[in-house]
């Protein structure tokens, strides 16, 4: 079966009831298997490991693209979240509950998202659908 849906930043596939949907090509730049601070296991195991700003697909390949990019930008200072999960900065490593689960953005996040949108529209067929999810908290 040819995959007709691309999830460009699938992460832990929390967007899906069926995490093995045969119609979806799951892509993420990360591959992670760990346990979260509350003891739950968490896995990022994409079909394709690739960067959403430079995707390895031909133009007009998918009838639907799901774009749920990393959205963690700030978690610093003396906040409760920083106490619980740590904080991010330009030198942060991919550790800590929130960074592992949600991915992180850095100072060039606007350019990164613009490149991601350009790639999503490039690989989407004419008349296709783009589902964009963003969280600004």
Question: Where are these predicted regions, by residue range?
Answer:
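Class I S-adenosyl-L-methionine-dependent methyltransferase catalytic core
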Residues: 1-137
């Amino acid at each position: 079966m040819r995959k007709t849906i691309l999830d460009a930043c699938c992460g832990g596939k929390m967007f899906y009831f069926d995490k093995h949907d045969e119609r979806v090509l799951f892509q993420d730049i990360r591959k992670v298997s760990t346990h979260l601070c509350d003891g739950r296991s968490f896995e990022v195991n994409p079909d394709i490991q690739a960067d959403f700003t430079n995707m390895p697909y031909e133009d007009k390949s998918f009838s639907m693209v799901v774009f749920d990019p990393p959205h963690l930008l700030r978690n610093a200072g003396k906040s409760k979240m920083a106490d619980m999960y740590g904080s991010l900065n330009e030198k942060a490593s991919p550790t800590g509950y929130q960074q592992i689960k949600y991915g992180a953005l850095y100072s060039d996040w606007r350019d990164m998202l613009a490149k991601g949108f350009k790639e999503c529209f490039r690989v989407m067929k004419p008349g296709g659908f783009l589902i964009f999810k963003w969280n600004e908290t």
